[in-house]
Amino acid sequence: STPAITLENPDIKYPLRLIDKEVVNHDTRRFRFALPSPEHILGLPVGQHIYLSARIDGNLVIRPYTPVSSDDDKGFVDLVIKVYFKDTHPKFPAGGKMSQYLESMKIGDTIEFRGPNGLLVYQGKGKFAIRPDKKSSPVIKTVKSVGMIAGGTGITPMLQVIRAIMKDPDDHTVCHLLFANQTEKDILLRPELEELRNEHSARFKLWYTVDRAPEAWDYSQGFVNEEMIRDHLPPPEEEPLVLMCGPPPMIQYACLPNLERVGHPKERCFAF
């Protein structure tokens, strides 16, 4: 029998209950929300995200998240969230509204989920359906390799796609991930990524760059640049799809111009 889908209608908000909260590190948490029954799945195609909405200080706040669980998981959905605490980022003294709200939630509290949302769906075996915009029908792109550039929390949609590819032994798509963070301790989901790399080294290539590198650091330092793209993403000759997710300035100033210099045409670049 097909499992019941939680997100039946993308226009309806579904309240889900917090059932577990795990401290991953100083500012990262894993939140587990119960689906309506133990037999339910979330119903989120690979490549799509959900929106959380909550009334915070009298205002409706809505933020996109990509779960780290999948439709293989019944009865729950997991989100890994970086909490932006107030008074820790000079530019954002108030911190992150939604992440601090999640941090303040108690077991048994509910929050509203809505989705699926997004312009890309991974259909398996190298096949991506991408809508140029909300009104268009999807264009199918089939590739042998995928380049991925993620910044900070932008890793979550990449992990979702990587996991979908790696879990199918008949999917021979090769993923090359370049993952940028401020410091080594900011690397979100590092254990999960390294486990995947160790299990699937032929199909999953992983490279980090950090703004501030520790003394003995085996990877790159600094912003994403042309050299990193040349060295750690598939070559343009393979006609890969290049996926990006991260802060808008990273995509606009670090990714797109350098991808173009290396020879990756805009038509094959997609930003989540």
UniProtKB/Swiss-Prot annotation:
The protein's assembly and partners: Component of a complex composed of cytochrome b5, NADH-cytochrome b5 reductase (CYB5R3) and MTARC2. Interacts with MTLN; the interaction is required to maintain cellular lipid composition and leads to stimulation of mitochondrial respiratory complex I activity.
GO molecular function: cytochrome-b5 reductase activity, acting on NAD(P)H; FAD binding; flavin adenine dinucleotide binding
Keyword Oxidoreductase in record: yes
Protein name stated in the entry: NADH-cytochrome b5 reductase 3
GO biological process: cholesterol biosynthetic process
EC top class named in words: oxidoreductase
Subcellular location: Endoplasmic reticulum membrane; Mitochondrion outer membrane
FAD-binding FR-type domain sequence ranges: 11-123
GO (cellular component) term, any one: mitochondrial outer membrane
KW Membrane (keyword) present: yes
Result for mutant: residue 63 to K: Km values for NADH and Fe(II)-[cytochrome b5 similar to that of wild-type
Stated consequence of mutating residue 49 to A: Similar properties to wild-type
Modified residues (N6-acetyllysine): 13, 21, 91
Family classification: Belongs to the flavoprotein pyridine nucleotide cytochrome reductase family.
Catalytic activity: 2 Fe(III)-[cytochrome b5] + NADH = 2 Fe(II)-[cytochrome b5] + NAD(+) + H(+)
Keywords, comma-separated and alphabetical: Acetylation, Cholesterol biosynthesis, Cholesterol metabolism, Endoplasmic reticulum, FAD, Flavoprotein, Lipid biosynthesis, Lipid metabolism, Lipoprotein, Membrane, Mitochondrion, Mitochondrion outer membrane, NAD, Oxidoreductase, Phosphoprotein, Steroid biosynthesis, Steroid metabolism, Sterol biosynthesis, Sterol metabolism
Annotated consequence of substituting residue 65 to A/F: Protein destabilized, release of FAD accelerated, and kcat values decreased
Effect on the protein of changing residue 97 to A: Little effect on absorption or CD spectra
Protein role: Catalyzes the reduction of two molecules of cytochrome b5 using NADH as the electron donor.
Cofactors required: FAD
List of residues binding FAD: 63-65, 80, 82, 84, 97-99, 156
